[in-house]
Amino acid sequence: LRVAYWKRYGATLLGMIEHHAINPHAFLQDTHPLPDLLAKLGPHKALQESLRRLKGSKVILTNAPRHYAHAVLRHAALDALVEQVICIEDMCFAGRFRPKPSVAMLKMICARLGVSSRQCLLVEDSVENLRAARRLGMQTILVLEHGWRGRPRSAHAGHARVLTHQVHSARQLTRLLSVRSSPAVKAER
């Protein structure tokens, strides 16, 4: 059910609201437990160094709930390295949640940040989210996790048209961006 709603709506939460009339805030709290994750997670030195070296504003844009995103960032010692964290609770307008990959939400976020979408770079692990960003003219980088053998989690035919680049690590991202100048970096990991 979780995967089916994620594929159909872009976020499991939207399917749960649509079909089960759940309380979204209770759902987000109950479905994002932290203790097990935090036990496996520690400071991420390579990512810390990469974020320190990147030019431009760094904004986390995540479909995760606020309590979860902030706890993960603190535990990984990344919280002081980003200017802003935009969570799923912030992706609500006209009385409805509009998480990634909503093009309308991405436009709203750009307006809120006071930047043109063409000034933004979205670093993501979801091709669908990158596709929405490319429709607005954003630069895009697909993060491939180790062990995927080059296949993104949400691979679709023709995904190369929505990608500016692909990377496998924080160090590779830093090297790639060190040769480019980007006024705003939007990161999600």
What are these regions (language model features)?
Residues 1-4, 35, 57, 93-97, ...:
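Conserved short-loop catalytic and cofactor-binding motifs
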Residues 1-45, 66-70:
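N-terminal helical cap/lid subdomain that shapes the substrate entry/recognition surface
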Residues 38-42, 60, 97-101:
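Short, surface-exposed alpha-helical recognition segments that flank or form part
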Residues 45-46, 104:
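Short, conserved clusters of charged catalytic residues that mark active-site
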Residues 46-55:
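Catalytic-core regions built around general acid/base machinery
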Residues 52, 66, 70-189:
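Asp-based, Mg2+/Mn2+-dependent phosphohydrolase catalytic module
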Residues 57-59, 139:
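Proline-centered loop/turn at the N-terminus of a beta-strand
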Residues 62-64:
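Conserved phosphate-coupling serine/threonine residues in phosphotransfer and NTP-handling enzymes
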